[in-house]
Design a protein with these regions (language model features):
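Cytosolic nucleotide-utilizing catalytic cores of signal-transduction proteins
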Residues: 1-136
């Protein structure tokens, strides 16, 4: 059933290649697998989760990602390459970026701990999301 959601999939297609589509169809093991194999390893690897999330929210624009994170573009390139090694997906590839985007959303929804994003001088988070002040 999940293969209908990705008509361009190579045939035969492996079940693991359809993880996002399986999640959309309500497959709980696929949901856990995406969180465990993509979100958690990126989160455990320092700045990789933040870099990948920012890159995806910047529409895959390397320079914009570097500006948002206050780092050199080569740092972004290195981190994206490293993220691919850690999770097995190359976010510069459209299909892999889709898989990673779904995995990151699932990780946030699953209650996985979130790291704070750096805040720019204008009060915006580096990813472009508004920062909501919290009371202590």
């Amino acid at each position: 059933m999940a293969v209908r959601a990705w008509p361009e999939a190579p045939r035969p297609v492996l079940a693991d290649d359809l993880l996002p589509e399986r999640v959309l169809a309500g497959d709980t093991p696929a949901r856990r697998r995406l969180v465990d194999t993509v979100h958690r390893p990126l989160e455990a690897s320092g700045a990789l989760l933040e870099t990948v999330a920012t890159y995806l929210s910047c529409g895959g624009a390397l320079e914009a990602t570097a500006r948002a994170l206050f780092v050199h573009p080569n740092t972004v390139r290195y981190r994206l390459r490293r993220a691919g090694e850690v999770c097995g997906y190359d976010v510069t590839d459209p299909r892999d970026a889709y898989v990673v985007r779904v995995a990151l959303a699932l990780g946030r929804l699953s209650g996985a701990p979130r790291r704070a994003l750096p805040v720019r001088a204008d009060g915006e988070a580096a990813s472009g999301a508004a920062v909501v002040p919290t009371q202590l």
